[in-house]
Amino acid sequence: IHPTCIPVHGDKQSKLTLMSESLRNDGRIWVPKKLEDAKALQAGTKKPTDIPDADRDFYLERRYPAFGNLVPRDVASRAAKERCDAGFGVNNTGLAVFLDFKYAIDRLGEDVVRARYGNLFDMYEEITDENPYKTPMMIFPAIHYTMGGIWVDYELMTSIKGLYAIGEANFSDHGANRLGASALMQGLADGYFVLPYTCLLYTSDAADEGL
């Protein structure tokens, strides 16, 4: 599950669009504290810029002060869904939370933010017709990829003798949700530490059996 995707905005959007997790380095995630504000946002009678900071719930920063908006993907995804399930979602479907760069722009300047995220902001604006420099982005978790699926034994061999599956093709070494770049790490671990021994073991066994 990827927590930083563009939610459904209209009938012509066929899927949720994956954004970069790098956005959470500087963007602050929030929903309204008041349910009536969330309902007004869903109905389109209020804009996010109408809601003062005091009425914004930066729920990841509140729940996880040591990590803030940089919590692992599975934590960010579950927290966003929980807030939306509680009625605090912010787009017309109620299935979105805000990712706000106002604070980064105030702190760093728009030029710095543009240099870091300009291509992502352009993609967001092209899809949503909203300017993320002026109004908060909306994001929602989406299915990113299937975590494994091919059966392997403890030596990473499939049900077909001599055929091994490594990396994300077999299973996840990383628990509830993978961390950034862990696909590479899992492939390296399987390939470097496991396959040289398992393949040699299998080929020696096969030789003994006259195969």
Indicate where each model-derived feature is located.
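An anion/pyrophosphate-binding glycine-rich loop and adjacent beta-alpha core
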Residues: 1-126, 197
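Short loop/turn motifs at secondary-structure junctions and domain boundaries
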Residues: 21-22, 140-144
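Alpha-helix capping and helix-loop boundary segments enriched in small/acidic/polar residues
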Residues: 16-20, 108-111, 134, 154, ...
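A conserved FAD-binding loop/helix module that cradles the flavin
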Residues: 174-196
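Conserved small/polar residues in nucleotide/adenosyl-binding loops
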Residues: 202-207
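Short FAD-binding loop at a beta-strand-to-alpha-helix junction that anchors the flavin cofactor
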Residues: 159-177
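FAD-binding beta-loop-beta segment adjacent to the flavin cofactor pocket
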Residues: 145-164
